[in-house]
Amino acid sequence: MAAKEVKFGDSARKKMLVGVNVLADAVKATLGPKGRNVVLDKSFGAPTITKDGVSVAKEIELKDKFENMGAQLVKDVASKANDEAGDGTTTATVLAQAIVNEGLKAVAAGMNPMDLKRGIDKATIAIVAELKSLAKPCSDSKAIAQVGTISANSDESIGNIIAEAMNKVGKEGVITVEEGSGLENELSVVEGMQFDRGYLSPYFINKPDTMVAELDNPLLLLVDKKISNIRELLPVLEAVAKSGRPLLIVAEDVEGEALATLVVNNMRGIVKVAAVKAPGFNDRRKAMLQVIAILTGATVISEKVGLSLESATLEHLGKPKALVLNKENTTIMHGAGAQADIEAAVAQIRKQIEETSSDYDREKLQERLAKLAGGVAVIKVGAATEVEMKEKKARVEAALHATRAAVEEGVVPGGGVALVRALQAIEGLKGDNEDQNVGIALLRRAVEAPLRQIVANAGDEPSVVVDKVKQGSGNFGFNAASGVYGDMIEMGILDPAKVTRSALQAASSIGGLMITTEAMVADIVEDKAAPAMPDMGGMGGMGGMM
């Protein structure tokens, strides 16, 4: 085991504070409408230009192990805020820096660190409750567009396209962000449910000009196994042929003799049929088949529940209005599933989303929920260069997270004003002792930090602006973009309550832990000696030079 270096007390905290300030100073330059960009060097390709706090934080590693620990802890604040709300990373970093700087001054002055933390925690709980009471519902397109615009660094085109996407696919619908090929942002919406599996054979195509297979008023057979023997399929194929309707088979796979027979039947016009693989693998495939079944009123044919393919009847088949298959995707239009079943499945998936701790599982569950609850919208980001494209795409993704958070928990006045207004919740708050009171007062000063930083980045005097905002009430605040005071909501400067809340909670949590640090342990960095010169072997053959 490598030898360790241990630092105690003030010397440990001073080192940690250096790391905190290096990272926070780089991140906070991006805050507000007049925040600056940060250029990140990449090991290959062009540098990345960003105004996204968490992207800047992730790039920072310091040479000194103890300073780096401080930087990594603040990086965790940004990540926590990003994981919960998808935005507010810069605000969280600024708050954490203020809490740590104020807290370590109090510790140096002889206050008890544990009581300081308890005071900070008490004040945080009160401010979070006040933020929730200040929040107003965010339901109309105008408010959604304003939230998206603010989060996308005051880019109205991004706010508007997100509002339009939400309007088309609903609050639960899937909205994905992709790199476009043009200069302008584009929005395309897929009605109905889509999954990423295309036709198994090009011989199923019935629209050669567009290379798609379109099935009108079809029947849908869902099978949770591979189909290779055509005999299993014959009873259901005969019943479908008598009905005169087209058929789509969705199975784990359709191969060999079974696929060849389906192709021949389709080409001869005996049964208009197509086949695709079921989306996903193993348990996810079973779950997706169940979602398709609920949406279309079908029953999944699975031997695990006692249903064999030979016993399948028309009653087991789904009845969507139309199906469109291309090489990569299958789209189900207007499934005929019972509304009560769809609502029950939506409620169950929502419960699973709340309970899961895995980001990947949550993403897949939300995808499944969206397939049941709404359509799919794709925002294609347009830009002139690849560097601009990456920067713009990151802003669109941040804005999308912010608007989802706003719809979830409502909006509060933006520009750091909500935190200043929430201070009224701790006006008369008292701790159990004087050190806890110092912790409460410390947080009171720290929550002004985001407003101060926004004003400083805009080139104005922070103290003057903070005093004027404090004298006002309600939504009164400072518009850093135009330099005027007024009603923040009316000026369209909104923040999602969830973003502000999670930024404060993450900053208080990590900030409080850093204040209570008394010792730090790190590996000793050994300077590697320069390699020795190779043995020259007596420099043979050079004896006659003397």
From Swiss-Prot:
Out of the domains of life, which is the source? Answer: Bacteria
Residues binding ATP: 30-33, 51, 87-91, 415, 479-481, 495
Q: Name one GO biological process term.
A: protein refolding
User: Where is it mostly found?
Assistant: cytoplasm
Any one Gene Ontology MF annotation carried by this entry is: ATP binding
* Reactions this protein catalyses: ATP + H2O + a folded polypeptide = ADP + phosphate + an unfolded polypeptide
Q: Which InterPro entries match?
A: Chaperonin_Cpn60_CS, Cpn60/GroEL, Cpn60/GroEL/TCP-1, GroEL-like_apical_dom_sf, GROEL-like_equatorial_sf, TCP-1-like_intermed_sf
Gene3D superfamilies, A to Z: GroEL, GroEL-like equatorial domain, TCP-1-like chaperonin intermediate domain
Quaternary context: Forms a cylinder of 14 subunits composed of two heptameric rings stacked back-to-back. Interacts with the co-chaperonin GroES.
- Its function? Together with its co-chaperonin GroES, plays an essential role in assisting protein folding. The GroEL-GroES system forms a nano-cage that allows encapsulation of the non-native substrate proteins and provides a physical environment optimized to promote and accelerate protein folding.
Please give the NCBIfam families that the UniProt record associates with this protein: GroEL, PRK00013.1, PRK12849.1, PRK12850.1, PRK12851.1
Which family does this protein fall into? Belongs to the chaperonin (HSP60) family.
**Descriptive protein name:** Chaperonin GroEL
Organism expressing this protein natively: Azotobacter vinelandii
